């Protein structure tokens, strides 16, 4: 399991989006599925981004 500390440099939005892209590739998401997740992540503020990320990748990543 990947652990990302929201208070660390790795906890910034750009890194979290990058981790999401990497995980979606590994899991075989289609382009359409990946785009939908990214759009939802980017549709609000940082807390929304983290919430969608955690809901989507709860088996693979823990945000602390």
Language-model segments: residues:
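Long, contiguous binding/interaction regions
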Residues: 1-64
């Amino acid at each position: 399991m990947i652990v990302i500390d929201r208070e660390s440099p790795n906890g910034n939005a750009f890194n979290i989006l990058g981790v999401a892209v990497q995980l979606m590739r590994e899991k075989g998401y289609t382009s359409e599925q990946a785009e939908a997740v990214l759009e939802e992540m980017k549709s609000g503020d940082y807390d929304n981004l983290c919430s969608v990320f955690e809901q989507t990748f709860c088996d693979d990543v823990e945000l602390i």
